[in-house]
């Protein structure tokens, strides 16, 4: 089944804001691959201010590094990933959404679909033509 993970990662070092998000996404990716899953795409969305001050583990956060991950896995692995994310102190908020694959197997992430791209193949062809 295809899932989409949206994560908000804390920023501890202003000089290297991507560091913890990169470590977290590689940890989650390894967990998916070890359990016979496939990571389709990781979309870094950059640093954004949060709509309100959020608390996690007695820390207050007003901005976070956002990322989106598109992956295939079983339902058991998906719930294990969510459990791991809830325990991780680097994660401020996370959400996993099941992507509907009724008519199309090559599905882009919700972020890319909002920009008008319908499949990952369209994104790859666009990147290839720009080179």
Swiss-Prot record:
GO term, biological process aspect, one: mitochondrial translation
SUPFAM superfamilies, sorted: Ribosomal protein S6
A molecular function GO annotation: structural constituent of ribosome
InterPro entries from the UniProt entry: Ribosomal_bS6, Ribosomal_bS6_sf, Transl_elong_EF1B/ribsomal_bS6
Signal peptide coordinates: none
Cellular localization per UniProt: Mitochondrion
Keywords carried by this UniProt record: Mitochondrion, Ribonucleoprotein, Ribosomal protein
Domain of life: Eukaryota
Entry GO terms, CC: mitochondrial inner membrane; mitochondrial small ribosomal subunit; mitochondrion
Keyword ATP-binding: no
CDD domains: bS6_mito (cd15465)
Stated family: Belongs to the bacterial ribosomal protein bS6 family.
Subunit structure: Component of the mitochondrial small ribosomal subunit (mt-SSU). Mature yeast 74S mitochondrial ribosomes consist of a small (37S) and a large (54S) subunit. The 37S small subunit contains a 15S ribosomal RNA (15S mt-rRNA) and 34 different proteins. The 54S large subunit contains a 21S rRNA (21S mt-rRNA) and 46 different proteins.
Database matches in NCBIfam families: S6 (TIGR00166)
Biological role stated in the UniProt entry: Component of the mitochondrial ribosome (mitoribosome), a dedicated translation machinery responsible for the synthesis of mitochondrial genome-encoded proteins, including at least some of the essential transmembrane subunits of the mitochondrial respiratory chain. The mitoribosomes are attached to the mitochondrial inner membrane and translation products are cotranslationally integrated into the membrane.
Protein name, as recorded: Small ribosomal subunit protein bS6m
Organism phylogeny: Eukaryota, Fungi, Dikarya, Ascomycota, Saccharomycotina
